[in-house]
Regions:
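N-terminal Rossmann NAD(P)H-binding glycine-rich loop of SDR-like oxidoreductase domains
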Residues: 3-26
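Conserved beta-strand positions in the Rossmann-like core of class I SAM-dependent methyltransferases
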Residues: 28, 48, 168
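NAD(P)H-binding glycine-rich loop region in Rossmannoid oxidoreductase-like domains
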Residues: 32-41, 45-100
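C-terminal amphipathic/interface module of NAD(P)-dependent oxidoreductases
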Residues: 46, 50, 55, 205, ...
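Conserved Rossmann-fold NAD(P)-dependent oxidoreductase catalytic core, especially the SDR/UDP-sugar
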Residues: 81-144
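Hydrophobic positions on the long internal alpha-helix
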Residues: 101-105, 109, 156, 160, ...
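Conserved beta-loop-beta element that borders a ligand/cofactor-binding pocket
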Residues: 116, 120-124, 142, 155-178
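Alpha-helical substrate-binding/gating segment
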Residues: 175-179, 187-212, 216-217, 228
Length: 240
């Protein structure tokens, strides 16, 4: 299957790309960095050198790639977390990707006649209430410290689920593992980066339009739906 992967050089993208290739998919990895494009080509995948905010160029690249599936794993967060001030500066940038970058990706996917759109969201945005949270529970989009992040995620999900394409939202927990900020879980709900990539591979051919919690079981968030409909395994690891 032909897949257009936005965010191919990010924390998930670096673990996800070889899994997609191993599964027999043809991957076009999107990046705005020429050096990253060279690295993707050396990894054996096609590349699209384009900025998500350049709507016309993105549409051209997407149509040229002619993907059956578009996967949105883009974020704008620091690669190395040195202090909390970095996050305060990054949140608005990340929200812009979720709001405006998503809109451009959806428009490009529609122009390319893609048949499925997969996007990463967050499983740590539920409003306080009974646990474990299911996908039907409301998100905490009220004013407060998390309003920018969760509000943008909620809008992104709405865009995907109302696009007219089959859309799958993967709500990830806090990442840990290779290429992330932490070697082990530090906050709940957590998810190993390999597990997040594993879920994305499953979503290429499984599941139905809607949301799926992708976390490790700790009693805060339910993964029953992902287990049942995706065949999700929260213990999955890439070796090495």
């Amino acid at each position: 299957m032909k897949i257009f992967l936005a965010g191919a050089t990010g924390a998930i993208g670096r673990r996800l790309t070889p899994l997609l290739v191993a599964a027999g998919h043809h991957v076009t990895g999107m990046t705005r960095n020429p050096a990253s494009a060279d690295a993707l080509e050396k990894a054996g995948i096609s590349t699209a050198l384009v900025d998500v905010f350049d709507a016309d160029a993105l549409k051209t690249a997407m149509v040229d790639a002619a993907p059956e599936v578009v996967m949105h794993q883009l974020t704008d967060l620091p690669h190395v977390l040195e202090n909390e001030n970095q996050l305060a500066a990054a949140y608005p940038r990340n929200a812009r990707i979720r709001l405006h970058g998503t809109r451009n990706l959806i428009a490009a996917a529609q122009a390319a006649a893609a048949r499925r759109f997969i996007v990463q969201s967050v499983a740590f945005g539920y409003a306080p209430g009974r646990e474990p949270h299911s996908e039907d529970d409301p998100l905490d989009v009220k004013d407060g410290p998390r309003a920018v992040t969760i509000g943008a995620a909620a809008d992104m999900e709405r865009q995907v689920l109302t696009s007219g394409m089959p859309g799958i939202v993967l709500r990830y927990g806090f990442f840990y593992g290779p290429g992330t900020w932490h070697e082990g879980p530090t906050r709940r709900p957590a998810v190993h980066i390999d597990v997040a990539a594993h879920a994305a591979v499953l979503a290429v051919t499984r599941g139905h339009t809607g949301t799926y919690n992708i976390v490790e079981e700790d009693g805060t968030v339910s993964i029953a739906k992902a287990r049942s409909e995706l065949g999700f395994d929260p213990t999955f690891r890439v070796f090495p």
